[in-house]
Amino acid sequence: MEKKILVIGDSCIDSYAYCRSTRLAPDKPVPVLEVLDTINTPGMAYNVFRNVVSLTKFPKGIDLLTNERYEDVVKTRYVDAFSNHMFMRVDSVVNIDRIKDNNIKDGYDTVIISDYDKGFLTAEDIEYICTNHPQVFLDTKKILGNWANAARFIKINNHEYERSKDYFQNTNVQDRVIQTMGSEGCYFNGKQYPVEQAEVMDLSGAGDTFMAALAVKYTETEDIDSSITYANSCASKVVKKRGTTVVWEKLF
């Protein structure tokens, strides 16, 4: 039976300007960058969506609800073309309109909220969606509050976990929190899930891939243990690649 997944969140364009620098500016001691190549890919929630489509057996059942004109929201990373060292990141300043309708149509087996806290979703919107759908996977840059209580699973990295510690200490949600810890894998419900060691080329988008793989596998199996293991494996493949990319089911 075909599964349906909806991804909700704010999107952008991830732009990678691959450069070389052979001299310093004459007026200031800063490197002069010569851009050799530029690669643009959809990022943030759109990257989660792309990964879900690439991993699921039912790509026609995958939908995305995101901000209009997401192409105007650009994160530009200036990266050395040879060492992959990132010189700097420049973000465009764009006001993102709030979601127009947070009523989710029936028929979705899973909803993924990928909230980068750029204005598309408020805490009230997230609470409403989680309350009105039984299987929401939540990944948010907001400091968590009681509005997140109804999420089926909360995926959170170390930095965001520390910011939301008060919430975790005062609520009973630990059995639904998946804490990602980079090269140390992730932690869920008292168990650590190790990840294969890999030479890291770029961490950009690894969290998106983890979230997509986790939700896809759980939608298929309803087994959170195997879903976390699968998500770890997918994320470890992505960090070996440059830029914001997707992982394909055929690799497994």
Where are the language model's segments positioned?
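Generic enzyme active-site microenvironment
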Residues: I5-I8, I112-I113, F137, K155, ...
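Conserved N-terminal subdomain of the carbohydrate kinase-like
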Residues: K3-I5, I13-I113, A123-D125, T245-F252
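Catalytic cores of large soluble enzymes that bind and process phosphate-bearing ligands
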Residues: D37-M44, D117-L121, F153, E160, ...
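Active-site metal-binding loops of divalent metal-dependent hydrolases
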Residues: D10-S11, Y116, T209
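Conserved phosphate-binding/catalytic region of the ribokinase-like
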Residues: V94, G107, D125-A150, K165-F252
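Short hydrophobic/aromatic-enriched beta-strand-loop microsegments
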Residues: P59-L64, F153-N158, Y193-V195
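Conserved beta-alpha-beta core of the PfkB/ribokinase-like small-molecule kinase fold
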Residues: T22-K28, K75-V93, T110-Q169, E184-G185
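Short beta-strand/turn micro-motifs composed of small residues
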Residues: G9, V53, T66, T140, ...
